Amino acid sequence: MKSLFAVMILAAVGLHSDPAFAQKSKLRADRIQIEYVPPKNPDHEPLFRLMKERRVLEKFKEFLSPLRLPRALRLKFEGCDGDSNAWYEDDAITVCYEYFDDIFRNAPRETTPAGVTRADAILGPTLEVFLHEAGHAVFDYLKVPVLGREEDAADQFATYLLLQFAKSDARRLILGVAYSYNLDASKPSTKKNPFADEHGLPAQRFYNSLCMAYGADEKLFADLIEKGYLPKERAEGCADEYDQVVRAMTKLIRPYIDETRAKRVREKQWLKFDVQ
């Protein structure tokens, strides 16, 4: 009996020392922290004030709060000495003021022939960059297995979440993101060898985002085919591509979602397309 009791104790100790068990025991929702770092460049001061007035980081904090994470994740805006960039590193998602400056500068003043408004071209890429970097953070924090390039998986993570908004909002966000990719694709690459980059080429990301959107709702995005934005040959497999992402999100990410908080997030009206 004593030996059996000893075995039980050792087994319990072994179970609780298992890294996977320890990580799960620490998981909880509402682990998001935020930081607006005052810009060094005075040209970014209006953008800094606008982001604070609009409570942009507070909204992202609430939107991501259902994620059950093992430790805190910080979201922050800061100046990057002229570098237009965004990244996840050391438990923090950083988006540069320069990056948002480019988004505002590149957004069209008038509605485009494709129906993209200035607000679409600002809100879409703004949400996408945070959700893309959040994808990297989630993969790291939760040790999510990724088959293929992590950058592609982060794009899919972001696009999937954009498509969970109300249909009319989701359409505008996706078209705003596609506008940004298409604009980047039209410019000469500044990289020495863009084919060696960990990211897909802007043109590839453009078609991938449209394909996921069409696969999610063929009726809502039917005009992508009619107007020639998405080739019919690619469109034929888009429903399967989207379903594959849904299965991955359901199996790999959903177990780490606090459903009570997620319900509140889903019920909230998030977007106001009033950006100038």
Model-identified regions with their sequence ranges:
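Short alpha-helix carrying the canonical HExxH Zn2+-binding catalytic motif
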Residues: 119-138
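Pan-zinc metallopeptidase signature
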Residues: 24-34, 192-276
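Bacterial N-terminal signal peptides
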Residues: 6-14
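An active-site-proximal "capping" alpha-helix that borders the catalytic cofactor pocket
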Residues: 147-166
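Catalytic zinc-binding patch centered on the HExxH motif and its immediate surroundings
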Residues: 77-94, 99-109
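Zn2+-dependent metallopeptidase catalytic core
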Residues: 48-72
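Acidic/histidine-rich, surface-exposed loop or edge segments in extracytoplasmic proteins
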Residues: 27-48, 138-140
